[in-house]
Amino acid sequence: MDQSREAMAWYSHRSCPQAVASNLRRLVVDDYGPAMHAPERLTVYVDGFNLDHGLKERSGRRLLWLDLVKLSRLLRPRSSLLRVHYFTAPVLDDPPAASRQGRYQSALVARNPGLVEITQGRYQKKTRTCRACGASWIQYEEKETDVNIATALVADAASCATDAALIVSADSDLSPAIRTARSLNTTMFLAAAFPPMRYSAELSKLMPASFSIGMSKLTGAQLPRTVVDPASGRAYSRPAKWM
């Protein structure tokens, strides 16, 4: 979808009667002239598992040091960002990877005080066995991320906590939650931003707008090489393995 069509899709919901009524309640009057619309309040829901795997398939690890707040603002520059809700799970049985993950999350929060909320799911360890040769191996399955996203999205819709929801994922398991959110809050606008190498025909059909996140947005939204926490003074540097 080109930029103009994307913008039209994003804002076309304003013609809906319910959305117009909602927007009328949010008019802002300044000292210089007539009332103006307040910026649309936006919450971004990031499926960390879906995003990370797409980034790795597309470019290895070089884009993992990603500023999700900056990316959200690049994707929706006309909206007023309330928060980025990041859903992930702690790495198991790999201390170096767990250290890199923790460093990234700390840098992300330090760079964007008050704008990032992180919800942790879990990985479940399972033993798999080859029926043909009898060999066995350990496999890790990510659990709870889709449930956590669904819970947050539906809760925000029910409480009218946001005007618009941007879901960074191509996981079609989120479809029931999206339908529920839309039924609970008919004025809340929802859109899907598909990570690299990811696409869902079901979500694309279900959502008023959907698009793939372009490489220029991803490369333009990298965190600084070193992030310093303004509160503690602690520094978090980009892992060498992510260069």
PLM region descriptions:
Residues 6, 18, 26-27, 34, ...:
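Residue-level marker of intrinsically disordered, low-complexity segments enriched
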Residues 9-139, 189-191:
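Domain-level signal for Mg2+-assisted phosphodiester chemistry and nucleotide/NA-binding surfaces
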